[in-house]
Amino acid sequence: MAGLTRTAGAFAVTPHKISVCILLQIYAPSAQMSLPFPFSSVAQHNRLGLYLLSLTKSCDDIFEPKLEKLINQLREVGEEMDAWLTDHLTNRFSSLASPDDLLNFFNDMRGILGSLDSGVVQDDQIILDPNSNLGMFVRRCILAFNLLSFEGVCHLFSSIEDYCKEAHSSFAQFGAPNNNLESLIQYDQMDMENYAMDKPTEEIEFQKTASGIVPFHLHTPDSLMKATEGLLHNRKETSRTSKKDTEATPVARASTSTLEESLVDESLFLRTNLQIQGFLMEQADAIEIHGSSSSFSSSSIESFLDQLQKLAPELHRVHFLRYLNKLHSDDYFAALDNLLRYFDYSAGTEGFDLVPPSTGCSMYGRYEIGLLCLGMMHFRFGHPNLALEVLTEAVRVSQQLSNDTCLAYTLAAMSNLLSEMGIASTSGVLGSSYSPVTSTASSLSVQQRVYILLKESLRRADSLKLRRLVASNHLAMAKFELMHVQRPLLSFGPKASMRHKTCPVSVCKEIRLGAHLISDFSSESSTMTIDGSLSSAWLKDLQKPWGPPVISPDSGSRKSSTFFQLCDHLVSIPGSVSQLIGASYLLRATSWELYGSAPMARMNTLVYATLFGDSSSSSDAELAYLKLIQHLALYKGYKDAFAALKVAEEKFLTVSKSKVLLLKLQLLHERALHCGNLKLAQRICNELGGLASTAMGVDMELKVEASLREARTLLAAKQYSQAANVAHSLFCTCHKFNLQIEKASVLLLLAEIHKKSGNAVLGLPYALASISFCQSFNLDLLKASATLTLAELWLGLGSNHTKRALDLLHGAFPMILGHGGLELRARAYIFEANCYLSDPSSSVSTDSDTVLDSLRQASDELQALEYHELAAEASYLMAMVYDKLGRLDEREEAASLFKKHIIALENPQDVEQNMA
């Protein structure tokens, strides 16, 4: 019946909300012209206001707090007036002796609100602004009460009795003072079963005989009165037999209240939908951050979600939390099922900063938003062509219905899809429904389409004030500028530019614009999470000492709490904003990696891990850890890298295609090649290739990585023709899917293959082409490596090219020694020694110190890498130099090192166990 069940998504009047209204009458009494009693200072008055505001916005639980908890918090908030506040609250409840008193109470609540069109207000007049947060709360309570039917009023009256009885039993158990219980005992002694129907019936007869007028809530037919009487009696008997304690669900970072003594329908005591959604968002963050730890209980989360879904089935975010929980529990079939449920049930109702469309139609169940969700799901599951078709349809419907917000999000999703997935051609799919793409040219490349979509999405998001989308688009534009050379659509004519290079200044500008616009997040409407987090933190701090005790523990209540102690929580931003700021630092780190500045890349990664590690998504945090581990492997060696990798494996979930697993396989492959264990290296290549999806265009980064490592393994095995075939096939794939940066690496690999096969002349064009690509994309460190390979190729043509090779090497030396890793620096040192030894115009006796210093540096750096082949070459050259100088002891020592590395290279099985 109406009023006995909670309407989905409705704001319901509950005993807790009545408690807040009673306290609001104290905070802002009607027609008060000065500081109201019992406040002795403005600070006390403001502190109670902060407390009431926190009660209406906190999202630390799904259930409203019990009266016992409310009284305990009042003792912390009220300081010396806590006893008066508690007595007033309990006395006011005891004065609600009939449903008529509830009507009078809510009529009195109108008096604390100021008029919406009021004129001049005196300075010392206390009026609750109807449009303020507390004013809106009071107005919603009054409206919700006025909408209650007669059964609803009776049920609310009955729930107040249970609310007060529960507090009485709790305080009696812990020996509460008698002066705080007198009012509650009155409620405990009331026979609400007899009163619920007998007293109203007597009043009906009295009112009829006296004046013929019946109060609004008693103006009810006899049949309905009898039905309600039976219903209330049955509910009372059921609640008495079902009284039992239930343990609190241990949700991570969550609920502090226990779900005790379910005397009435628990759904009636749920918090508002906004508060519950804020709580669920915090739980989603907790599952992502702590879901893989051993202390995290997925079963308790599941039981909590089951309970919430029964109480509030309209909250579709429950399916998303269940998906995350199942995912971290390795139950992938259940995770997929819940994810599909979330997309099915929540399309158009959650998850977007929506702006009302110009048509004014309903915002719920929008078809275009359902298409957007479906397209993103196809994208995440690795179905790029299906995703592109669905997103194209979403663009068409969004334009047809004038939903500019959904159109902006869809364009951003399409540009992200085209950037991340390998789509060779979009003809026949993209462009038919979106006029800016269609009108520009019919033969646009995928790269040009991505750029147009990004610019259009950015323009629309900026005009609609979608700050998060604007910031996200700026970061996407920075990534586009980093990875692609912008060529004009019409690249001919006398004024056509011949300079085709990426612009690091543009990349930096886009990143800074994204971070700058994120600071304006407060202008958006989605501030529920901000206020909820602040309010929850403020309420939790009521139970903590604010600082060193000013008064001795025996001196009574704490008086050092002031209004200004809220400053501890002045800085609080939504998780999505924090993740975007962190993503900008990760993008900075990636750009510095490509540009070749290892210190800057490491610094930005450390900034991210330090400032945003706790608030970031598990995927971004995992990426930051792996960047630091890669830095350790390149500049410190495998021992430190594997130690850090072990920590990362414990922290993050290691599943198929996880970043931790991929990095582990990459490090194992590098170490296997350096140690000469080619069988292990080939097995790891097969594992990497097996992790990639067989679908065309999916997992392109992983496929390129596996092919590169396969070619390098074949090169180490001296199977030059097969290695060249794999590299050529990989280059064709990169060209087909417009992977320009990967082209530079593949060309450099082809030059290495020809160099080691003895065909230096054939390797020169590949090295020069790689350098050209590096110049276009500002890949300074890769260019230095390609220059070193080019110098080695020139030296391979004969000793008469020694000077040219040395000039090339010395030109790249600043970049190699300043930013190169251990292997690159060792190669440069060994090659420099080779040049001096091959130069017929130089003498070993005169340049011996230069040669030996280079070889010693190379030997020391190769020791950490366990690179036996290069280390053996360095030891061999050192032995030759010592032999020409007649230093026999040093020659024998270098020869023994050479023998040691050769033996280790020929017997790799001895080190295979250490790689697992």
From Swiss-Prot:
Q: Give the source lineage, highest ranks first.
A: Eukaryota, Viridiplantae, Streptophyta, Embryophyta, Tracheophyta
Q: Which CDD domains match?
A: Apc5_N
What's this protein's name? Anaphase-promoting complex subunit 5
* Major location category of this protein: nucleus
Summarizing the function annotation, the protein's role is: Component of the anaphase promoting complex/cyclosome (APC/C), a cell cycle-regulated E3 ubiquitin-protein ligase complex that controls progression through mitosis and the G1 phase of the cell cycle. The APC/C complex controls several key steps in the cell cycle by mediating ubiquitination and subsequent degradation of target proteins such as cyclins. The APC/C complex is required for the female gametophyte development and is involved in several aspect of development by controlling cell division and cell elongation. Involved in the control of endoreduplication.
Q: According to the UniProt record, where is the region Disordered?
A: 234-255
Q: How does it assemble?
A: The APC/C is composed of at least 10 subunits. Interacts with PYM.
Gene Ontology cellular-component annotations: anaphase-promoting complex
Q: Where in the cell is it found?
A: Nucleus
Supply the alphabetized keyword list. Answer: Cell cycle, Cell division, Mitosis, Nucleus, Ubl conjugation pathway
Any Gene Ontology biological process: protein ubiquitination
Which pathway does it take part in?
A: Protein modification; protein ubiquitination
Q: What is the organism field in this record?
A: Arabidopsis thaliana
Q: Which family does it belong to?
A: Belongs to the APC5 family.
Biased composition annotated in UniProt, kind: Basic and acidic residues: 234-247
Give start-end ranges for the coiled-coil region(s): none
